[in-house]
UniProtKB/Swiss-Prot annotation:
The record marks 124, 162 as: Essential for DHBP synthase activity. D-ribulose 5-phosphate binds at residues 26-27, 31, 138-142, 162. It holds the Pfam family DHBP_synthase. It comes from Bacillus cereus (strain AH187). This is Riboflavin biosynthesis protein RibBA. Mg(2+) 2 binds at residues 27, 141. Its EC number is 4.1.99.12, 3.5.4.25. Zn(2+) binds at residues 255, 266, 268. CDD domains: GTP_cyclohydro2 (cd00641). Its cofactor is Mg(2+); Mn(2+); Zn(2+). Catalyzes the conversion of D-ribulose 5-phosphate to formate and 3,4-dihydroxy-2-butanone 4-phosphate. Catalyzes the conversion of GTP to 2,5-diamino-6-ribosylamino-4(3H)-pyrimidinone 5'-phosphate (DARP), formate and pyrophosphate. The gene is ribBA. The keyword Chaperone does not apply. The lineage of its organism: Bacteria, Bacillati, Bacillota, Bacilli, Bacillales. GTP binds at residues 250-254, 271, 293-295, 315, 350, 355.
């Protein structure tokens, strides 16, 4: 149904337009996107004729500073915090509204000699400032446009226009597919762009290495930072893992209440200890400790979920009532750490099939699933049963 990111990049490099869709739980819309560097009056005319939305120009913070583009409003109350600046027209234009003059304004924005005084305000071009980090920080069309431009090796600026149906309603995926077919345009999703970037870019940095004696044995501890969300993760390595043989690996998500306080609401603490003990017994392996508290929702939200569980909701229902998916964890950063450690073939300590799929999506091969089941307690029986029934965990209860 959708095209590959590589196909869209090739078209963009040729000055063509692509359609980019965002998540159905976000704006659930599609935009025409082109590279600002290659913009023409014909492309602008196509966008306003068949897109019918607002023509905007996503740019980096650097462009905004050079052109002295202040925020459109002092207090942004937009639900998605779309970063509009004041609208502009280049001083060489007349009304600034024609396709030709809008293209002129956009091209002059990219002119390194241009400065703030070269543009009238307000105008008919609406710059948008993309967040640093692009779609990995904010999954919006603004960031997608700048990311696509950078992936093409072009100036980091795009031209976007929302796609609206002839009857004035927003075009959804079925409408967008028809539009893409009608005009022979590549169509991609922001979700796929995120996956593409995570697959092709190195987001983790090995920061420090120490020897760490523990109650379970002595490990080589390696601390990692990541450029995606600034969270710090740690890998505990046992033995020589560079032989190319399958390595026993546990990817453990942080659980303060279980790992530190010994909470009986979950089985996290016992799983952590059992994994370390098993790796020590085998003499070779990795425990990757990921800062993904509460399946990715954070400590306070996990406690709020616990409160809802006390009111009768199960662990999945509690997450959903708080507005989160059942499992918000992302395995891309963990996969990059494992690859940095030189691992390729894993014997994965897990009861969670999604974790296997999540890691294998990043060119890691799970040779074997090694069960890690702890005895159920009265306090966590319902929790564990929900993980089986709703999250597909492989447990014998």
């Amino acid at each position: 149904m959708f095209h590959r990111i590589e196909e869209a990049l090739e078209d963009l490099k040729q000055g063509k337009v692509v359609i980019v869709c965002d998540d159905e739980n976000r704006e659930n819309e599609g935009d025409f996107i082109a590279l600002a560097e290659y913009i023409t009056p014909e492309t602008i005319n196509f966008m306003i004729t068949h897109g019918r939305g607002l023509v905007c120009v996503p740019i980096t913070e650097g462009y905004a500073e050079r052109l002295q583009l202040e925020p459109m409003v002092a207090h942004n109350t937009d639900s998605h915090h779309t970063a509009f600046t004041v609208s502009i027209d280049h001083v060489s234009t007349t009304t600034g509204i024609s396709a030709h003059e809008r293209a002129t304004t956009i091209r002059e924005m990219l002119n390194p000699a241009s400065k703030g005084a070269d543009f009238n305000r307000p105008g008919h071009i609406f710059p948008l400032i993309a967040k640093e980090g692009g779609v990995l920080r904010r999954a919006g069309h603004t960031e997608a446009a700048v990311d696509l431009a950078q992936l093409c090796g072009a100036e980091p600026a795009g031209v976007i226009c929302e796609i609206i149906n002839e009857d004035g309603t927003m075009a959804r995926v079925p409408d967008l597919l028809q539009c893409a077919k009608q005009f022979d345009i590549k169509m991609i999703t922001i979700e796929d762009l995120i996956a593409y970037r995570r697959h092709h870019e190195t987001l983790v940095t090995r920061e420090v290495e120490i020897t760490l004696p523990t109650d379970f044995g002595t490990f080589h501890a390696i601390g990692y930072s990541n450029s995606l969300d600034s969270k710090e993760h740690i890998a505990l390595v046992k033995g020589d893992i560079s032989t190319g043989d399958p390595v026993l690996v546990r990817v453990h998500s942080e659980c303060l209440t279980g790992d530190v306080f010994g909470s009986c609401r979950c089985d996290c603490g016992p799983q952590l200890h059992a994994a370390l003990a098993q790796i020590e017994r085998e003499g070779k392996g990795v425990l990757l400790y990921m800062r993904q508290e509460g399946r990715g929702i954070g400590l306070l939200n996990k406690l709020r979920a616990y409160k809802l569980q006390e009111e009768g909701f199960d662990t999945v229902e509690a997450n959903e009532k708080l507005g989160f998916p059942a499992d918000l964890r992302d395995y891309g950063i963990g996969a990059q750490i494992l690859k940095d450690l030189g691992l390729q073939h894993l014997r994965l300590l897990t009861n969670n099939p999604r974790k296997i799929a999540g890691l294998q999506g990043y060119d890691l091969e799970v040779i074997e699933r090694v069960p890690l089941q702890m005895p159920a307690k009265e306090e966590n029986k319902t929790y564990l049963q929900t993980k089986v029934n709703k999250l597909g965990h492989l447990l014998n209860l």
